[in-house]
UniProtKB/Swiss-Prot annotation:
Residues 21-29 form a propeptide. Glycans are attached at N138. Involved in maceration and soft-rotting of plant tissue. Hydrolyzes the 1,4-alpha glycosidic bonds of de-esterified pectate in the smooth region of the plant cell wall. This is Endopolygalacturonase B. PROSITE patterns: POLYGALACTURONASE. Residues 1-20 form the signal peptide. The active site is at D203 (proton donor), H225. Its EC number is 3.2.1.15. The lineage of its organism: Eukaryota, Fungi, Dikarya, Ascomycota, Pezizomycotina. GO terms for biological process: cell wall organization; pectin catabolic process. It holds the Pfam family Glyco_hydro_28.
Length: 364
């Protein structure tokens, strides 16, 4: 009898342990903290909450968070740093569906780009790693990250339904030697929203090379090349459509707002609105549309292979430096049309003598 009772008790305890094991395993996977890049790479895809605690990413390696579990939350905690090596990067790569990316209070991502900066950016000198690959990061959110001193380009975005809010990219230390430190480069993407970005850099605050339904709003851009569409043309995807860039400030930058298309290329830029943009301390062009871009430089001869149609410039105000040009429109024959132009009031600087094929209603 005692033997039977003991056997029953043992069996019951064993059954309880077997039942508890999967639950414990699930608990372990629901929230994970990683302190190394290798551990995060091998384990993050199993976790619903991924905490990255003061990770020191080894030189030449990517903090690889691709293939995250659907609905996962990623939290940067402490200071994330990266070892030095000349390579193309990216320093961080992330993909998944319905992902939320944020940081704990006081956290920062410190790229220490000064180790690579040599005034040449991605045009020579040291090979520099790009910062963050957000490719196939769909139906997701990136919130409140504080990023310092990217070696070259910041976010490379090829995703659908991605919202980036209240992100700071501070490359102000790169004023003398930083170059090509674009904050947000967008290509082949749909329904991208960037809201409340604060950017100090040495290239485009945003550059939209292709994509549809893209919004940039409530931004502050300092030190770079302004708010840009393009360059468009010469890629596999050369369509920009349904873009709104609004309620933003561009200060101490080369350009204010810009559309640039590639010389002799084909493509289209349609349904684009620049609205409520305030400029100050602009050193080259307050507003520029140029269809003569070749190998990174203007030729002075625009071509008409890229349509720039249904464009709105509304309430673009502020000032440019005395040596700068207020507005420059250099369009190919017949390629710029159906523009809406109202409340464009840029002061200082000089009037352009190079405008060509200015569409009806616009003023150069």
């Amino acid at each position: 009898m005692h033997f039977l009772q003991n056997s029953l008790i043992a069996a019951a305890m064993g059954a309880a342990l077997v039942a508890a094991a999967p639950a414990a395993d699930l608990d372990a996977r629901s929230s994970c903290t990683f302190t190394s890049a290798s551990a995060a790479k091998s384990g993050a895809s199993k976790c619903s909450t991924v905490t990255l605690k003061s990770i020191q990413v080894p030189a030449g390696e990517t903090l690889d968070l691709t293939g995250l579990k659907s609905g996962a939350t990623v939290i940067f905690e402490g200071e994330t740093t990266f070892g030095y090596k000349e390579w193309k990067g990216p320093l961080i790569s992330m993909s998944g569906d319905k992902i939320t990316v944020k940081q704990a209070s006081g956290a920062k991502i410190n790229c220490d780009g000064a180790r690579w900066w040599d005034t040449k950016g991605s045009n020579g000198g040291k090979t520099k790693p790009k910062f963050f690959s957000a490719h196939k990061l769909n139906n997701s959110k990136i919130q409140g990250l504080k990023i310092y001193n990217t070696p070259v380009q910041g976010f490379s975005i090829q995703s659908d339904h991605l919202t980036i809010s209240d992100v700071t990219i501070d490359n102000s230390a790169g004023t003398s030697k930083g170059h090509n430190t674009d904050a947000f480069d967008i290509g082949s993407s749909t329904y991208i929203t960037i809201d409340g970005a604060t950017v100090y850099n040495q290239d485009d605050c945003i550059a939209i090379n292709s994509g549809e339904h893209i919004t940039f709003t409530n931004g502050y851009c300092s030190g770079g090349h302004g708010l840009s569409i393009g360059s468009v043309g010469g890629r596999s995807d050369n369509t920009v459509k349904s873009v709104t860039i609004s309620n933003s400030k561009v200060v101490d930058s080369q350009n204010g707002v810009r559309i640039k298309t590639v010389y002799k290329a084909t493509g289209s830029v349609t349904d684009v609105t620049f609205q409520d943009i305030e400029l100050s301390g602009i050193t080259k062009y307050g507003l520029i549309v140029e269809q003569d871009y070749e190998n990174g430089s203007p030729t002075g001869t625009p071509t008409n292979g890229v349509e720039v149609e249904d464009i709105t410039f509304k309430k673009i105000t502020g000032s440019v430096d005395s040596s700068a040009t207020r507005v420059n429109i250099l369009c190919g024959s017949g390629s710029c049309k159906d523009w809406t132009w109202s409340g464009v009031d840029i002061t200082g600087g000089k009037k352009s003598s190079k405008c060509k094929n200015v569409p009806s209603g616009a003023s150069c």
